[in-house]
Swiss-Prot record:
This is Glutamate racemase. It comes from Buchnera aphidicola subsp. Acyrthosiphon pisum (strain 5A). Gene3D superfamilies: 3.40.50.1860. Belongs to the aspartate/glutamate racemases family. The gene is murI. Coiled coil: none annotated. The active site is at 69 (proton donor/acceptor), 181 (proton donor/acceptor). Pathway: Cell wall biogenesis; peptidoglycan biosynthesis.
Length: 262
C-alpha cells in the first residue's frame, strides 16, 4: 500500500489504517519538495501525482494507492484512475455528511485554495448550497501551521485569528465545520478555541469514509502483501525533516530514505 501527501497530514490516515489493519505493510511518500500542494497549479498537481505513483511502482510492488490529500483527490483522482491499473483511493471534503449534522444550516468549509477552486468542490458546493449556507475559507497557510506544530513550533493565535477573521465577525458562526485538508485535524483544538470558546462545534473530516472504503475493498478482494517492510520515503532532505524523525517513531518505519522525483 502506497500512501502519499506533500506533508504529514496524510499520517492521520495512516494512523487510522493501522488501527483497522494492524498487520498491513505500507509505504508513506512525503513529497516535502512540493509542500504544500494547495498553492500549485492543476497541471503541476496532476503531473506530480503521476510521477510519484509511476516512480514508486517501478521500485516497489504496490497494489493499492491512497491519496492522503484533498487537493490531489479533487484535482487528479479521476485522471490517475484512468492512467494506472491498480485501485486508487482519494479523500474529499465531506459536504454531504455536514448537511445531515448541521442544526443552524450554516456549514463551514476550510480547504486549500486549489481544493476550493477544483471543479469537483465547486459542483458539490453548488449542489448543497440550495438548502444550506456554506461559508468558505480557502487558505494555504493552515497546512504550514499544522506542519510546524508537528515539529514542535507553537501555534500562533494571531495567525489563526487572521485566517478565521471572516468567521469571527459573523453574527452566527457555522455549527459544523468540514476539514477539507488532512492537515487540519491536527489543529481542531486551536480552531475551536478561536471560534467557539463557549459553544460546541462539530468537525467533519473524511478520514473515516476513506478508511471504510479501503477496508471494504480489502474484504472483497484477494490482495497479497508483497511489501514486507514499512517504508518512509521523502523527496527533499532538509532541517524540517530531521525534526520530524522523532515523531515518526510511532509508525514503526524500518526504512527511511530519500527518493528522487525529478
Amino acid at each position: 500500500m502506497l500512501i502519499f501527501d506533500s506533508g504529514v497530514g496524510g499520517l492521520s490516515i495512516l494512523k487510522n489504517i493501522k488501527k483497522i489493519l494492524p498487520n498491513i505493510h505500507y509505504i508513506y511518500m512525503l513529497d516535502n519538495e512540493s509542500f504544500p500542494y494547495g498553492n500549485k497549479t492543476e497541471f503541476f498537481i496532476i503531473q506530480r501525482s503521476i510521477k510519484i505513483i509511476h516512480t514508486i511502482k517501478k521500485i516497489y510492488p504496490i497494489n493499492i494507492v491512497v491519496i492522503a490529500c484533498n487537493t490531489i483527490s479533487t484535482v487528479a483522482l479521476s485522471i490517475l484512475r484512468e492512467k494506472f491499473d491498480i485501485p486508487i483511493f482519494g479523500i474529499f471534503p465531506h459536504i454531504k455528511a455536514a448537511e445531515k449534522i448541521t442544526k443552524n444550516k450554516i456549514i463551514g468549509l476550510i480547504a486549500t485554495k486549489a481544493t476550493i477552486n477544483s471543479s469537483y468542490t465547486q459542483k458539490t458546493i453548488y449542489e448543497y448550497s440550495c438548502s444550506n449556507t456554506i461559508k468558505i475559507i480557502g487558505t494555504n497557510k493552515l497546512a504550514v501551521i499544522a506542519e510546524k506544530k508537528i515539529r514542535g513550533v507553537a501555534v500562533s493565535q494571531k495567525k489563526l485569528k487572521n485566517i478565521f477573521r471572516p468567521w469571527i465577525n459573523l453574527p452566527t458562526c457555522p455549527d459544523t465545520i468540514i476539514l477539507g485538508c488532512t492537515h487540519f485535524s491536527l489543529l481542531e483544538k486551536e480552531i475551536k478555541n478561536i471560534l467557539y470558546k463557549t459553544r460546541s462545534v462539530y468537525f467533519i473530516d473524511s478520514i473515516k469514509k476513506v478508511i471504510f472504503q479501503i477496508k471494504s475493498y480489502l474484504k472483497t478482494s484477494n490482495v497479497n502483501q508483497k511489501i514486507k517492510k514499512n517504508i518512509f520515503l521523502y523527496s527533499k532532505n532538509n532541517n524540517n525533516l530531521k525534526k520530524l524523525l522523532s515523531f515518526l517513531k510511532q509508525y514503526k518505519f524500518t526504512v527511511i530514505k530519500h527518493i528522487n522525483l525529478n
